[in-house]
Regions:
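Protein kinase glycine-rich loop
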Residues: 25-31, 36
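AlphaC helix of the eukaryotic protein kinase fold
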Residues: 74-101
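Activation-segment/catalytic-loop signature of the eukaryotic protein kinase fold
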Residues: 113
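Conserved short submotifs of the Hanks-type protein kinase catalytic core
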Residues: 117-131, 135
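Activation segment signature within eukaryotic-like protein kinase domains
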Residues: 150-151
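Protein kinase catalytic-loop region centered on the HRD/HxD motif
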Residues: 156-166
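Conserved activation segment of eukaryotic-like protein kinases, specifically the C-terminal portion
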Residues: 203-213
Length: 213
């Protein structure tokens, strides 16, 4: 079940979220626990002329265990391993909800999460400026000013996560995206942990990114 084209949603598939409707444009990639798509949606913005609707690109992550799941039409199937699938699906849904509550300029913004097609989706900000790893390679390193700027931005994002009882356990340049204005955005919470009120960590499933994994 590893061939992404056999099991991914097709171009122009419509997904109905809680607040938005999404049209699948293309596949961005696939990891062990999900398929990430580029999609279009309408959002309302306020300006001098009042409230207007505009079309934006978003990334949508679909919970899909490539070693377990299949697909009939758009519906995700799980065969005889439904127990395993539904356990992980429940975790994925809870963690998507937690991520949707985060609001920080240097953490990828989750618009909403929702259930459809026997699985869970969440829509997030699409950051298309490339990742920090690629930027470092292209520039043959960072300047001192850039190093200080990115360290501060990501440090602020991590402090915000910690204040919300979340840990990011896969911090690396490949999981830091750059907006077109060169601001850093922390993505890929696949190895994050959520702490409960008693301070006990619960290991996550693979969730929360604008990248395939």
């Amino acid at each position: 079940m590893s061939n992404i084209n056999n099991y991914a949603l097709k171009q122009n598939t419509i997904l109905y979220g809680k607040s938005h409707t999404y049209t699948i444009e293309k596949i961005l990639g696939q990891g062990s626990f999900g398929i990430t798509y580029l999609a279009m949606t309408q959002v309302k913005v306020s300006g001098a002329l009042g409230e207007l609707e505009t079309t934006i690109q978003v990334a949508i992550k679909e919970f899909f265990m490539k070693d377990i799941n299949g697909r009939e039409e758009n519906t995700v199937t799980c065969g005889s391993r439904g127990g395993v699938y539904y356990d992980y699906k429940k975790k994925f849904s809870r963690e998507a909800e937690n991520l949707s509550k985060l609001n920080h300029p240097h953490i990828v913004k989750v618009l909403e999460y929702f259930e459809a097609n026997n699985t869970v989706y969440y829509a997030m900000e699409y950051v298309d400026g490339g990742n920090l790893d690629t930027y470092i390679t292209q520039q043959k390193g960072l300047t001192e000013a850039e190093s200080i700027m990115y360290a501060k931005q990501i440090g602020d994002a991590l402090s915000y996560m910690h204040a919300h009882k979340m840990l990011h356990l896969d911090l690396k340049p490949g999981n830091i995206m750059l907006r077109k204005n060169q601001e850093a955005v922390l993505i890929d919470f696949g190895l994050s942990k959520q702490y409960d009120e008693n301070g006990k960590p619960e290991t996550s499933t693979t969730v929360g990114s604008g990248t395939p994994g």
